[in-house]
Structure formats: C-alpha cells, structure tokens
C-alpha cells in the first residue's frame, strides 16, 4: 500500500487530504494511513506548501479563479491558513487584474441586459462567482464600462 501511495503522489502534487481519501478508498485503517502519510511527508512525496503553490498557480492561470475561490478550495482540502496566505502571495497583482479585466470584457460582450445598471450587476455576480474580491470587481467593471463609452 505504501508503494501504491508513493506512485499516486509521484504522478502529480497531492495534499494530505487527497492521500488520506485515496488510502481510505483502498481500505487502509487509520493507523496505517497515519504511518503512510508520515512516511510520504518525510520522503517529501507530500509537501503542503508545494501543493498549495501549484494549486494556486494552476487555478489562477488555467481556470481563472480569483483569490477567494482558491482560498476556499484550499480550506476544503484542510490546508493550514498560513500556508494558504503564503501561496496566495505568489499571485502577481498586475496579472491578476489583467485576468479579471479580460474575463469581464469577454462576459460584457455576451451579457444581455436592458440597462447598464443591470449589465454591471450581472458582470459583478459573474466575477464574484469566479472568486474575485468585490472591490476589485467593481473597479474593473467601472473601468471596462468607461472604455466602452469612449469607443462609441
């Protein structure tokens, strides 16, 4: 079971919660699970900080999630708060705002609304649902809205 767990952790970054779930699925007892997880951590197959960094990078770049949604997902995986904070600090602020602006611009062209107020409400709900902070979303919606006014 230990070798199986090592192979499982070698294929991609895993957190303790994922490994425990898989070991449980394989029928390991809590004592065996604890020993295997400790071994995997000692041999650096599992590293919470490394997992957190990879998770943040992937969800932010590829899934275009905001900090709030990423943080929530990491909490669901029982990652310590200090490790989450450290991982979220790796996000480049300029790139973060560019991703948010791009999402809002794409969505703005597809949203059907009678008034600008209604359109902005839909855009804000969309971006907040993606996990971006409300302040950043409102700022971005206003900025992209101003750009549209100048283009007309």
Describe these PLM feature segments.
Residues 1-152:
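An alpha-helical, amphipathic repeat domain used for nucleic-acid recognition
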